[in-house]
């Protein structure tokens, strides 16, 4: 019988195993909302405790080791010590969410609602500056607040958009070493998210961890810049890639092959129906920087490189392969053109599909348990053939998903 780590490594090598490997909770794009995590713990009869939030922005809950055992999860995640709001994730306190759930969040985060029912979030927890994000009344996650200053084209400086991307410190290296050693000891495949390596991810563009963000911080302006200000973005990506490679060199020296997979970038290139940029813009603006980063990883480490991109991305998949990505996620099977069979036939020898196991827009929240079982078994039959598949949902499991539907999904996996 394969170990969890062996199972994932075999999938990444496009080899079969004793069963399809499973990930829930190893990254910020393969997680589970804290409401569902609490419901799963209750279902499995695990001890009650406030769910620890591992991604504050999306309110994802920790899939602790006892829950991972119950769910049959083969992966474990390792992240940094600060969240997207520059809050200290090593220093937590108990708070009650607007929907009445007790959770553990960074001490700088106060979940108290204002008179309209909104919860405001501040960069570094500093209320001397305007809020950088908000959880609107009735919402189960947090949204960015754009603080774009007037843009003077003559004074645009790429360094302003690099303020949050820095060389890794000795303290951070020590923290990663401790976390990776603990994660590796579980026998699960270690998936690391070191941060600072996502090129042009609009989740980071607003600078929610900065008190006074400068540069281009409007998502609309950023997308327009992919056409209007390409040299500006090139310079950002060049310098960011320099920083990333220097950090990876230090991380490899400390962590080595105890890490199996690195999530380098979560930039979305697809919408439900199309792409956010043309193939030509992708090849000109992103591909050379991705390739330089990934080439370094492949030449100097044993790590496999994980790329997240939502949406209808078939036209750019060849570019992602050329750029050296090993893994694609979330495999949005209900987006235009993203047929599972076609993806496996055309791209399955080059990419490992990490996701696509169950549709999270319609099937998982609204299907019956029996419909979900059939759907999951069908996806596993298609994507799991000859390896190259790690089961996960299409992006994170959201707050409104009935726990019995998640159990139906997991029970179906046990029969594959």
Where are these regions (language model features)?
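Acidic/aromatic-lined carbohydrate-recognition and catalytic surfaces
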Residues: 66-117
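A gly/proline- and charged-residue-enriched helix-loop-helix capping module
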Residues: 96-175
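Segments that shape or occlude catalytic/ligand-binding pockets
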Residues: 36-37, 41-86
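Short, conserved acidic/polar surface loops in the N-terminal third of protein domains
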Residues: 80, 87-90, 123-124, 201-205
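Active-site loop segments of alpha/beta catalytic cores
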Residues: 1-41, 46, 50-53, 139-416
